[in-house]
Amino acid sequence: MSQPVQRAAARSFLQKYINKETLKYIFTTHFWGPVSNFGIPIAAIYDLKKDPTLISGPMTFALVTYSGVFMKYALSVSPKNYLLFGCHLINETAQLAQGYRFLKYTYFTTDEEKKALDKEWKEKEKTGKQ
């Protein structure tokens, strides 16, 4: 690409994405709240690989409820906060998966299967693989 074309492309990009409105949005809680809140779904996704005995049923239920409420809130405020909605949608999905794992292990796994799973998780813990 020639230099004038590169300059024109850069100028176009800057005018479109780096303007007063974008900067104004980036410096608001509408942006930084959801960005900082992404730690919860990231942790939930990471925990999907961990031992199901570590899952807290009440906490998982609380986080499912919390994410559901805030998804509704994100679409109820004006202007709609799609970043917050996306954060809680990801968290809702991860927490529902954790809830499934909790219910499956706690209520639908026989004692023999639990012993085998516990042995498997202890082996993984020893080798450091998860």
Swiss-Prot record:
The keyword Transmembrane applies. Keywords: Membrane, Mitochondrion, Mitochondrion inner membrane, Transmembrane, Transmembrane helix, Transport. Disulfide bonds: none annotated. It holds the Pfam family MPC. One of its GO terms (cellular component) is inner mitochondrial membrane protein complex. The gene is MPC1. GO terms for biological process: mitochondrial pyruvate transmembrane transport. Present with 396 molecules/cell in log phase SD medium. Its main location: mitochondrion. Mediates the uptake of pyruvate into mitochondria. The functional 150 kDa pyruvate import complex is a heteromer of MPC1 and either MPC2 or MPC3. It is a multi-pass membrane protein. Belongs to the mitochondrial pyruvate carrier (MPC) (TC 2.A.105) family. It is found in: Mitochondrion; Mitochondrion inner membrane. It comes from the Eukaryota. Disruption phenotype: Grows more slowly in amino acid-free medium (SD). The chain crosses the membrane at residues 23-45, 55-77. GO terms for molecular function: pyruvate transmembrane transporter activity. This is Mitochondrial pyruvate carrier 1. It comes from Saccharomyces cerevisiae (strain ATCC 204508 / S288c).
